[in-house]
Amino acid sequence: MTNMTQASATEKKGASDLLRFKIFGMPLPLYAFALITLLLSHFYNAIPTDLVGGFALMFVMGAIFGEIGKRLPIFNKYIGGAPVMIFLVAAYFVYAGIFTQKEIDAISNVMDKSNFLNLFIAVLITGAILSVNRKLLLKSLLGYIPTILAGIVGASLFGIVIGLCFGIPVDRIMMLYVLPIMGGGNGAGAVPLSEIYHSVTGRSREEYYSTAIAILTIANIFAIIFAALLDMIGKKYTWLSGEGELVRKASFKTEDDEKAGQITHRETAVGMVLSTTCFLLAYVVAKKILPSIGGVSIHYFAWMVLIVAALNASGLCSPEIKAGAKRLSDFFSKQLLWVLMVGVGVCYTDLQEIIDALTFANVVIAAIIVVGAVVGAAIGGWLIGFYPIESSITAGLCMANRGGSGDLEVLSACNRMNLISYAQISSRLGGGIVLVIASIVFSMMV
């Protein structure tokens, strides 16, 4: 009788624990309601292809696979955890035909038509830059470009050495491997690189692009993996890491900013106003006022970094408004990242491209080039006054990934989303620097 009572108590405790288990903060029965609703929608192929339908699908899917990725041994430490799990599964759902066309359209409308990615990045840039000490921000930005250049030099040297080991000429290594990897992603990197290649050499842009995007895809995977590894190294050797802070404050003496008072929802709303208006101004400058400087196009996110930095330096924003912008940024990065990663997997990840590019030589060369970017940026950053881990992530890995979505994947893998502003400088301004280098390299081949 006693054994039966104990067994009954154990069963009740197990059931109670199961009911209290939470997925994305929701008790299991409540999440089950959301999941069953989504499955009904999938079964009847009835989902609105607007923001409501898209966000419902992205929230529910992101929640379950985020929890799995967060808990899965090895994957959560070495591969990138929840965010990487989410976008890989989402990409597989498209590849395997599990998603219906309506579901793909709903997510695509959120990501492409409504451009949720732009809003996400704009909010993170504003919160990240406004939360930095004004004088420290100026000094760090001035030192960041040389760190990017150090990363490019490191990637080039490592790439040339490994290329020669495979019998590949120096010009081909630079043209087909180093420049696409370090060029700022797809739209701001591989696409304009193929145009420059065609205009300078007269050769096929399509042939160049297909090779460049394959190499870039492999490098992006290594960038994510290395980001997770660098996070682990930073935890073991704490003197190498600023735990999300780029600048070694001992190297840049500054006075502390004034402390913020009470923060209300209104200050948080002002953070949204500043995020959207600064983005709007950056867009106008990039598209109409200064579409190019010296023949090189500057992306609107690069302009936005400079605009928000100028706003911070102007003293127009009170400590409360800065704190409100930071609170909004934290909400987006902590509560909406899993949602965004579903969209990244559906709209920006092609598993077939990854599979096609997986040759032994391509994998080894791409990996070594990314290592070179990390080493170069770490050494350059240390000499400037930055922490090696943070400088290698932002000026190294965020140069070697696939641009805006790659920045989010890399930073989420190493738990450093607050470094998004520096990541965007790498992807945008750094990508522009690579385009200039490409013009010179391609002209030498003619």
Swiss-Prot record:
Pfam families cross-referenced by the UniProt entry: 2HCT
Gene Ontology molecular function terms on file: metal ion binding; organic anion transmembrane transporter activity; symporter activity
TM annotation in the entry: 23-43, 46-66, 79-99, 110-130, 148-168, 213-233, 267-287, 289-309, 335-355, 364-384, 425-445
NCBIfam families the UniProt entry points to: ccs
Location of the protein in the cell: Cell inner membrane
Amino acids binding citrate: 186-187, 402, 404-405, 428
Reactions catalysed according to its record: citrate(out) + 2 Na(+)(out) = citrate(in) + 2 Na(+)(in)
Protein name in the entry: Citrate/sodium symporter
Protein's membrane topology: Multi-pass membrane protein
GO terms for biological process, alphabetical: citrate metabolic process; sodium ion transport
Family: Belongs to the 2-hydroxycarboxylate transporter (2-HCT) (TC 2.A.24) family.
Positions that bind Na(+): 181, 183, 399, 401
Subunit note: Homodimer.
Keywords: Cell inner membrane, Cell membrane, Citrate utilization, Ion transport, Membrane, Metal-binding, Sodium, Sodium transport, Symport, Transmembrane, Transmembrane helix, Transport
Record's function text: Secondary active transporter that catalyzes the uptake of citrate across the membrane with the concomitant uptake of sodium.
Any GO CC annotation of this UniProt entry: plasma membrane
Superkingdom of origin: Bacteria
